[in-house]
A protein has these predicted regions:
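Metal-dependent nuclease catalytic cores that hydrolyze phosphodiester bonds in DNA/RNA
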Residues: 1-107, 200, 209-212
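A general marker of short, structured functional hotspots
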Residues: 11, 18, 26, 47, ...
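Mg2+/Mn2+-dependent nuclease catalytic core
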Residues: 91-189
Length: 212
């Protein structure tokens, strides 16, 4: 059985969608993720971590230092939406696809009243940015009680929301099948087998999670 996360699938999709000028860098980034290599935290990654942490603190009633008017307004808006929800909800489940058994795993930023919320801090936003993301198909598959998935997005100036409901997208099995076929066709399947096989640490992560 093999471990599979939306982060790995998203890294692969990012490579597939990259413009020619960025294809080499996107492939390098994906292979680094595939091979579980340590990565330095980039400025963009840290901005996302800090933004989510500020929302978590605000939801928990912990005061935060003001940053800027638009930033603080985004924090307040998203905190109101997430308030009363359950934070950091782990989800897991097994799937058999392309002749392989997978253990899917993820963590929802917030779950509230049947809605999964995921917080995104981006540099640039275009409508439909997450249309083909594997995150909402995977998480809605894993959390059967949720009816929809909403991305809460802040680009430094404005806030946005993208919502997806069941039936709006292809099942996660289709993405996994394409992913495995691509790995096979391009000679990377052994990297996946080597670095993503189930182990004790991963079993401990899913211990106690009600699987789909």
């Amino acid at each position: 059985m093999y471990w599979l996360t939306q982060s790995l699938l998203s890294s692969w999709k990012h490579f597939l969608d990259a413009d020619d000028a960025y294809a080499d860098a996107a492939l390098s980034s994906f292979l680094s993720t595939l091979r579980r290599e340590e990565k330095e935290t980039t400025q963009a990654m840290q901005a996302g971590i800090d933004f989510e942490a500020a929302i978590n603190s605000t939801v928990a009633g912990v005061p935060i230092e003001p940053v800027s008017e638009k930033y603080d307004q985004a924090i307040a808006k998203f905190s109101r939406i997430c308030s009363g929800g359950q934070p950091q909800v782990p989800v897991a489940g097994r799937l058999h696809v392309s002749g392989l058994d997978f253990q899917l795993y993820g963590v929802c930023d917030y779950v509230k009243a049947g809605v999964i919320y995921d917080i995104k801090r981006v540099q640039r936003y275009e409508y439909g940015k997450y249309l083909h993301s594997p995150q909402h198909p995977m998480y809605l598959h894993l959390l059967s009680g949720a009816s929809k998935f909403t991305y809460l997005i802040f680009d430094g100036a404005n806030t946005y929301a993208e919502t997806y409901r069941r039936g709006d997208f292809d099942p996660i099995e289709d993405t996994i099948s394409c992913f495995i076929n691509w790995l096979l066709a391009n000679g990377y399947i052994n990297d996946y087998f080597t670095h993503w096989e189930m182990n004790t640490e991963r079993m401990d992560k899913i211990d106690g999670i009600q699987s789909c």
